[in-house]
Amino acid sequence: RQFESKLSLRSLALSLQKIRHMKAVKPKKNLGQHFLTDLGIAKRIADTVDACPDLPVLEIGPGMGVLTQYLIEKPRPVKAVEIDSESVAYLHENFPRLKDNIIGEDFLRMDLTRIFDGRQFVLTGNYPYDISSQIFFKMLDYKDLIPCCTGMIQREVALRIASEPGNKAYGILSVLIQAWYSVEYLFTVDENVFNPPPKVKSAVIRMTRNEVTDLGCDELLFKRLVKTVFNQRRKMLRVSLKQMFPGLTPREDFYTADVMTRRPEQLSVQEFVELTNYVGAELERLQAEKNS
């Protein structure tokens, strides 16, 4: 009984220590910080990297390390990027194993080729809600460096990324990410496991690079076209595409193609590739006429 009592006191001391740690860094609204407080969910998120290639891991926005503590137990090198100087100081104090692997910078401004000396890595984190889309656009810029990405984001954004054509949530992120990655919606997370609780539910997803190495179209035009038509998603393509031809008049039958009567959420990634080639060919023809 005395032994059990000592165990109980030790458990209580550990619990109090965790509570003190939870209060060590105050969440900052301007950084979109919502600290995860459920250790079980943190471990589940950390375990999502196990299905990724056996590569180093980069965690974005570790905060107070609730996810980090499980990542560093895995047989992979781990680095963490944190913009909040208070969190960086906390991590240095509480995770001495990370040593020089805590990077106190803005992820969105970083050259990701220098993180692991040009080697590929897995991206993960409890991503700041206000910049999650920007994080994934950055991931796409370094898609050959990041074969796998996991983590937690707003449920709404997760649904958009995982949505299929014909779904109302299908949009810019859906097309651009699914062009290069296979997407898995893993599980939903309630609001009450965060400090402070966000106003929306969250979700954990995993994105794994597919076998596509070349879209078969002009990638810059593809991205521009996708963003253009989804910014007017309720309009037919023949209407929204006109702004891509300033000062130019496409041939008479250009807008009568069957695809032009559809709305952007009805097109698959492959159909967007075909549309890009269709639009690109017309732009080249018109430019040649203009220069002749």
Identify the residue ranges that each predicted region occupies.
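Catalytic cores of RNA-modifying enzymes
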Residues: 4, 8-228, 248, 265, ...
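Class I Rossmann-like S-adenosyl-L-methionine
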Residues: 240, 253, 290-292
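N-terminal export/assembly leaders
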Residues: 250-257
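Primarily a LysM-type cell-wall glycan-binding module
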Residues: 233
